């Protein structure tokens, strides 16, 4: 201890700097590695392709999980707006067809910790949010899952977004009442971007 007191202060400071320099370098390397790996896996911009106005063609199974294969078609418009600087978006869907008029709203929120999206859907007929479907995009395909009830039965819901290009995309919803062993598709939407005039 007496040796430290006898050294001039500038030598102590220089010794500390030289001693800590390798540690700071390691910390910078580690934080740089985690930042770059985090940036590679960040899905915050997964839905950027969809911002704008789209013409949509919907096919909907009228009575899912009943053995019925009766479908109805609808045509309409989907408007997608970015919110929260891209960490969310709002979808407004309006469509009409032989089965009537449909209006839906979807609030999609990105969770940066899990790097997943929650898709929260409501339609005008009941005015309530369905349980969110949770998932992510991998290799250009989005898969989202939830558990809901249909006619008093617990079911699984799978929502897939695929075939995404700057001007078109496909959405498919399916239900399973056997724990995901089999899936019955009940909603298909094909969207085509409305070009600016």
Residue ranges and their predicted role:
Residues 1-6:
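N-terminal secretory signal peptides that target proteins for export/translocation
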Residues 26-197:
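Hydrophobic small-molecule pocket/channel-lining residues, especially in calycin-type beta-barrels
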Residues 9-22:
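Bacterial N-terminal signal peptides
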């Amino acid at each position: 201890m007496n040796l430290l007191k006898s050294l001039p202060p500038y030598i102590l400071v220089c010794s500390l700097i030289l001693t800590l320099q390798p540690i700071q370098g390691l910390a910078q390397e580690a934080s740089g590695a985690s930042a770059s790996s985090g940036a590679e896996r960040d899905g915050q911009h997964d839905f950027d392709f969809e911002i704008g106005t789209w013409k949509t063609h919907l096919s909907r199974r009228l009575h899912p999980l009943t053995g019925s294969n009766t479908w109805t078609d609808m045509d309409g418009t989907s408007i997608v707006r970015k919110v929260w600087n891209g960490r969310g978006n709002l979808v407004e869907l309006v469509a009409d067809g032989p089965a009537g008029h449909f209006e839906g709203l979807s609030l999609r929120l990105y969770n940066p910790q899990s790097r997943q999206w929650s898709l929260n859907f409501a339609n005008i007929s009941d005015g309530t949010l369905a349980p969110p479907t949770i998932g992510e995009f991998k290799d250009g395909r989005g898969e989202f899952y939830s558990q809901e009830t249909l006619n008093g039965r617990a079911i699984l819901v799978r929502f897939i977004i695929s075939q995404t290009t700057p001007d078109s995309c496909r959405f498919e919803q399916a239900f399973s009442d056997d724990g995901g062993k089999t899936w019955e598709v009940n909603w298909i939407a094909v969207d085509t971007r409305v070009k600016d005039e």
